[in-house]
């Protein structure tokens, strides 16, 4: 069985402001320290990978905090989903393996994603060609330079300059004490 997690990386708000908003919404979550002007939120309810919950929370947070957010979901280390939110709306979404849940379908290349919007939202327009390449890489091809979807997410996180703990970590990872060793020294703020 592969890795499952979800999280939101927000650009703009302070950790304190996000924590206050989460408390007012009565959410149970962990929040990372700031890194390059971004913070990562690990919401307990979103960990169930219910897209309606993820989309609702993403809209609400970015509208309330007037910011951009990237919600990411890793499903069994086989599929990476993400949504880019800005100011209460979904700008675009992404699915790395759209045929994954169709047993009668051949594998298909990733759908969605918009490297220009993604780089603009996180203030790194010069990395757009690399982000475009990461999003469109077919991991089943012989030319694939990354082996699985966790590594695709980690590559996006690195190139976009997001907190490193945005890839490979979710609410359950933190709560259960299963953090990758490189993140053991991070102090996450608990909410709820």
Describe each model-derived feature in a short phrase.
Residues 17, 21-24, 64, 178, ...:
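Acidic/proline-rich low-complexity IDRs
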């Amino acid at each position: 069985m592969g890795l499952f997690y979800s999280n939101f990386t927000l650009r703009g708000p302070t950790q304190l402001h996000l924590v206050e908003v989460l408390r007012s919404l009565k959410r149970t979550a962990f929040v990372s320290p700031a890194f390059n002007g971004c913070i990562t939120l690990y919401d307990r309810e979103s960990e169930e990978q219910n897209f309606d919950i993820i989309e609702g929370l993403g809209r609400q947070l970015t509208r309330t905090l007037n910011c951009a957010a990237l919600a990411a979901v890793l499903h069994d280390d086989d599929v990476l989903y993400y949504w880019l939110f800005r100011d209460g709306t979904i700008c675009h979404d992404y699915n790395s393996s759209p045929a994954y849940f169709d047993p009668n379908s051949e594998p298909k290349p990733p759908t969605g994603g918009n490297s220009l919007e993604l780089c603009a939202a996180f203030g790194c327009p010069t990395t757009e060609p690399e982000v475009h390449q990461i999003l469109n890489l077919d991991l089943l091809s012989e030319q694939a330079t990354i082996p699985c979807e966790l590594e695709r997410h980690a590559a996006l996180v690195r190139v976009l300059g997001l907190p490193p703990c945005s890839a490979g970590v979710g609410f359950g990872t933190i709560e259960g004490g299963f953090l990758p060793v490189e993140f053991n020294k991070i102090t996450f703020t608990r909410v709820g």
